[in-house]
Each structure stands twice: as structure tokens, then as C-alpha cells.
């Protein structure tokens, strides 16, 4: 992987991790364009995912600081309930990761057709959430946190946007727009770090191929993903507040159709 390829893929990861257009789907498309096999860029994938976690920590630092300050009071307050909701939202993705990891990895290697189909599904979800006008709730309940977690678990499919699925689901449930965007970005931190840790351990044990990627490419990819992630995270929060997700639905529909057509021509 050349440094300019790492730059482009890093920018794609940072932007699409937060924008509701599927980071996994766009990385798959980008890797296919550059002729990079999935097994060859595991180390790069870990690096850019960790970079987006740092982006979240930077942009949502005030919220994270608020959570930890309240959590260490060791009492049942709003901060503690927030953490409980995040833990509840992690249950579905945890079950998928533990019991269905091999099946999910097999789907990731199934080509661009599944990516295109899932992008169309993302477009449908975003459209439904845009036109539905449920009464907004003040806070995200435990029940809603679990349902949003189910949406996140389904979004392990390449092309089905994680942020798009979780935010669209929350909007359909009537959750507060501003709080929903923050919750969606915070709830993904533990799963991303957990997956990166497991993949890193596999590489150390020799159970997975790290890929012969130059250090410069890894550094460039990290910086690109971090900077673009910071911009996209802040931008996405404002987009959700203003209810402008329909534009991303149109984008996903177009890219989905093009991807399906290209997959059939290969």
C-alpha cells in the first residue's frame, strides 16, 4: 500500500465512520479500486479504526468528562444511567462478535454485490427516519438503547451504515436528535477498541496476516482518519440536529446502484 492510497483510505474511513454512508462499504469499494485484498490490510484497518476512536474522544470530550465525573460519584445518577444504556446497547454486537464472527467475516469476503445491496438498505432506513415524525422523547430509555444496539449489530454487514442504522432507529423511536447523535458515537467506542484488540492479538499470535504495509502508510492513514473523523463527527452532530439525513439517503442509493452494476460487470 502506497502512502497516497493510505491517505485516501484514511480519509474515507474518517469521513464515513460518522457520516451515515457505511465506512466498511466504502473501504471495501476503495480497497477494490486499489486492488488491495482484505487479508493484506488488517493492520491498516486496525490503525484507522483506532484513529476514529480518538476523533470521538476529542470532539465529545466534554460529554465523556461529564460521564466519568458522575460515574465516580458511585451513585445512581444520570451519568450512571447513561453508562448503563451504553452497556445495554453493546449486548447485541457482543453476541454477534462472540458467536457469529466467522459468518460475518465470510460475508465481508463475498464481494461488492452485498455492499451495494446494504447501501440501498441504508438509503431506505435514512428515508424512513426523515419522513417519520414521532414525538421526541427527552432521554434515551434502556429499551431504546437495546433496540439501537440491535441496529448496530445488524450494521456489521458491509455497506449497512452503523451510524445511519443507529441514528435512524433512534429517530424512528422518537429519541432526542442531539442526544441521539452523541449516544450513537459514544456507544461504538468499546466495540471498536475490543475488535482492534482481538485482531491485534491474532496478528501477534500469527493467526492473522498483518500485511506488509510500510510504516509511513500506517502513519498517513492514521492522521488522515483522525483529522477527517474530527470534522465528520462534529458535522454529523449538526446534521442530525437539523434533520438533513435525506441527502445521505440519496447518496447511498446512487452509490449502491452503481456498486451493484459494477459488481455484475466484473
Swiss-Prot record:
Catalytic activity: di-trans,octa-cis-undecaprenyl diphosphate + H2O = di-trans,octa-cis-undecaprenyl phosphate + phosphate + H(+)
Enzyme class label: hydrolase
Location within or outside the cell: Cell inner membrane
Enzyme Commission code: 3.6.1.27
GO cellular component: plasma membrane
Segments crossing the lipid bilayer: 41-61, 82-102, 106-126, 140-160, 180-200, 213-233, 245-265
GO MF term set: undecaprenyl-diphosphatase activity
Membrane topology listed for this record: Multi-pass membrane protein
Domain of life: Bacteria
Biological process annotations from GO: cell wall organization; peptidoglycan biosynthetic process; regulation of cell shape; response to antibiotic
Family the entry assigns: Belongs to the UppP family.
Role noted for this protein: Catalyzes the dephosphorylation of undecaprenyl diphosphate (UPP). Confers resistance to bacitracin.
UniProt miscellaneous comment: Bacitracin is thought to be involved in the inhibition of peptidoglycan synthesis by sequestering undecaprenyl diphosphate, thereby reducing the pool of lipid carrier available.
Protein name per UniProt: Undecaprenyl-diphosphatase
Gene assigned in the entry: uppP
Amino acid at each position: 500500500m502506497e502512502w497516497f492510497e493510505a491517505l485516501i483510505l484514511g480519509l474515507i474511513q474518517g469521513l464515513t465512520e460518522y457520516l451515515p454512508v457505511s465506512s466498511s462499504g466504502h473501504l471495501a469499494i476503495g480497497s477494490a479500486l486499489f486492488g488491495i485484498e482484505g487479508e493484506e490490510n488488517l493492520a491498516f484497518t486496525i490503525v484507522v479504526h483506532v484513529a476514529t476512536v480518538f476523533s470521538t474522544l476529542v470532539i465529545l470530550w466534554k460529554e465523556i468528562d461529564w460521564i466519568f465525573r458522575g460515574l465516580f460519584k458511585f451513585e445512581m445518577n444520570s451519568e450512571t444511567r447513561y453508562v448503563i444504556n451504553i452497556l445495554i446497547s453493546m449486548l447485541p454486537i457482543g453476541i454477534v462478535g462472540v458467536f457469529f464472527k466467522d459468518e460475518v467475516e465470510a460475508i465481508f469476503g463475498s464481494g461488492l454485490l452485498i455492499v451495494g445491496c446494504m447501501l440501498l438498505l441504508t438509503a431506505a432506513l435514512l428515508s424512513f427516519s426523515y419522513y417519520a415524525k414521532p414525538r421526541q422523547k427527552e432521554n434515551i430509555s434502556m429499551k431504546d438503547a437495546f433496540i439501537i444496539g440491535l441496529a448496530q449489530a445488524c450494521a456489521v454487514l458491509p455497506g449497512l451504515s452503523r451510524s445511519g442504522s443507529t441514528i435512524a432507529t433512534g429517530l424512528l423511536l422518537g429519541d432526542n436528535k442531539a442526544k441521539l447523535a452523541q449516544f450513537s458515537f459514544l456507544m461504538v467506542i468499546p466495540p471498536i477498541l475490543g475488535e482492534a484488540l482481538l485482531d491485534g492479538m491474532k496478528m501477534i499470535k500469527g493467526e492473522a496476516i498483518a500485511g506488509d504495509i510500510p510504516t509511513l502508510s500506517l502513519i498517513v492513514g492514521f492522521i488522515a482518519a483522525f483529522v477527517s473523523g474530527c470534522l465528520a463527527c462534529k458535522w454529523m452532530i449538526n446534521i442530525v440536529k437539523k434533520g438533513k439525513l435525506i441527502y445521505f439517503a440519496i447518496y447511498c442509493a446512487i452509490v449502491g446502484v452503481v456498486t451493484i452494476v459494477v459488481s455484475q460487470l466484473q
